[in-house]
């Protein structure tokens, strides 16, 4: 088996080969780095690599097996970590010039739990500054490219992880999702990404700093649904350093993963009552809905109308959080912040306490509206994005019949209107490949579940993956 074939194996298969001593962790990690050496110059998926640290961890993983110790769920498997997660002893830039030399002395909760799985961290992946854009560009690293077409963006803000996995540099990684930042690049790059129920994965040391953040959570990304379910299981669980994390036992995301969706009630919507979509996206998404009917689900059109629209509340809380977390940097050296970050901070400074209170009230109303929807349905199906990946900094001028909106610090809201809803509502949501659109670029289907029902989202994703296999599709740069 060559390096490419190894890196396109599911992570749980890589782990099996390592545990059965068909291949060592050292050999698996070496294969990953050879792939990175070959492909990274075209994709810029990583900000920092840690070959010495990774090889040391791989040798330790092999030694533990030789000593008869029980392996972790991802024992010896190479994994990419988004550079918004704090990593002890490994440079953590947050995509910002301000942190270009920061080497933390602690791990985030997510990274602690990754290490506990036995996975080997190979490096920190590319991200826009503080995760603030749907494209992955920043002053700290070269612009990240999409392996399906390197002249196009991979999405953001977890664009580096998505690009690395899609190209076969590794099979699994982490992202974080504050407005779609796992699901958007998963869709644009043709991989699977899951945004968990908020609070399932503690945020300490990750995207959320000590300020109110209604939006952000870490999440798994992979070429295989089971891999993401395994990682989601490993990362979930209460930690008292994040009082917002959910107490009590973590649901088992694997026990019913293969049990299909027969009898489930599913509502489909092409617009979520929010925005039009481009024809190529609509064609692929609508075709995917038939698979759910064929699998025995009761599928019907869902008419939904949010009141008020979710966009403004999300934008208010996001920019208020940016000002609270990073406003002091704008006071110190505004020239060293990316323009999009500075614009968010400046908008945050225009907000009053009443503005934030109204936004919080509207988020609660949104949560109640969706709670009512999920009394009738087990799942919602919708597009992940309204358009496929576009050339760098050249978003489509129109989405369907509507002018594309880009008045949120350059964020092209009209092309990505469907994800941030479920950040504000806290619902679990995945993006899974469902076809191809303009230019042969991937299209993603968003699968949304009721609050704390990640298990059903992952189960439905697995059923769709089996009915419409996609992981054999490989991009030109791979």
Where are these predicted regions, by residue range?
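Acyltransferase
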Residues: 22, 27-30, 59-62, 252-255, ...
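Short, well-ordered beta-strand elements within core beta-sheets of diverse protein domains
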Residues: 14-20, 99-103, 216-223, 346-351, ...
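Long amphipathic alpha-helix in the N-terminal Rossmann-like dinucleotide-binding domain
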Residues: 52-62, 117-119, 128
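Structural helix-boundary/capping segments
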Residues: 38, 116, 166-269, 275, ...
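Short glycine/serine-rich loop/turn segments
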Residues: 74-218, 222, 243, 271, ...
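Short helix-loop capping/hinge segments that flank enzyme active sites or metal/cofactor-binding pockets
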Residues: 74-94, 255-270, 317-371, 384-388, ...
């Amino acid at each position: 088996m060559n390096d490419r074939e190894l890196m396109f194996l599911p992570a749980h298969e890589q782990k099996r080969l390592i545990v059965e001593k068909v291949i060592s962790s050292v050999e698996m990690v070496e294969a990953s780095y050879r792939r990175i050496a070959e492909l990274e110059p075209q994709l810029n998926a990583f900000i920092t690599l840690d070959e010495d640290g990774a090889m040391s961890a791989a040798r330790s993983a092999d030694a533990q097996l030789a000593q008869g110790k029980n392996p972790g769920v991802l024992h010896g498997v190479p994994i990419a970590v988004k550079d918004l997660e704090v990593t002890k002893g490994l440079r953590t830039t947050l995509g910002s010039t301000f942190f270009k030399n920061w080497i933390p002395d602690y791990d985030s909760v997510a990274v602690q739990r990754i290490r506990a799985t036995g996975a080997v961290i190979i490096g920190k992946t590319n991200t826009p500054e503080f995760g603030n854009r749907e494209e992955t560009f920043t002053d700290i690293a070269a612009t990240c490219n999409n392996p399906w077409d390197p002249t196009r963006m991979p999405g953001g803000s977890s664009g580096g992880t998505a690009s690395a996995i899609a190209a076969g540099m590794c099979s699994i990684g982490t992202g974080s999702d504050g407005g779609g930042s796992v699901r958007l690049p998963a869709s644009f790059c043709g991989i699977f990404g899951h945004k968990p129920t908020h609070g399932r994965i503690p945020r300490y040391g990750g995207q959320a700093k000590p300020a109110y953040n209604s939006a952000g959570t870490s999440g798994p990304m992979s070429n295989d649904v089971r891999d993401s379910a395994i990682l989601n299981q490993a990362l979930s669980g209460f930690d008292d350093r994040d009082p917002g994390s959910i107490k009590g036992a973590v649901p088992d995301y694997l026990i019913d993963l293969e049990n299909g969706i027969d009898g489930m009630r599913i509502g489909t919507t092409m617009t979520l009552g929010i925005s039009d979509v481009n024809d190529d996206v609509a064609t692929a998404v609508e075709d995917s809905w038939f698979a759910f009917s064929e699998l025995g689900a009761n599928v019907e059109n869902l008419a939904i109308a949010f009141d008020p629209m979710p966009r403004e509340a999300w934008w208010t809380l996001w920019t208020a959080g940016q000002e609270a977390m990073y406003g002091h940097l704008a006071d110190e050296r505004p020239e060293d912040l990316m323009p999009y970050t500075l614009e968010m901070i400046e908008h945050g400074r225009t907000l009053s306490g009443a503005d934030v209170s109204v936004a919080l009230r509207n988020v609660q109303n949104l949560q109640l509206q969706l709670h009512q929807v999920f009394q009738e349905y087990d799942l919602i199906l919708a597009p992940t994005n309204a358009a496929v990946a576009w050339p760098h900094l050249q978003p489509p001028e129109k989405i369907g019949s509507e002018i594309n909106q880009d008045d949120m610090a350059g964020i092209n809201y009209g092309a990505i209107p469907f994800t941030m809803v479920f950040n504000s509502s806290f619902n679990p949501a995945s993006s899974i490949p469902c076809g191809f659109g303009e230019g042969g670029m991937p299209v993603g289907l968003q699968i949304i579940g009721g609050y704390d029902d990640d298990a059903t989202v992952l189960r439905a994703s697995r059923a769709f993956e089996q009915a419409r296999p996609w992981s054999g599709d490989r991009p030109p740069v791979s």
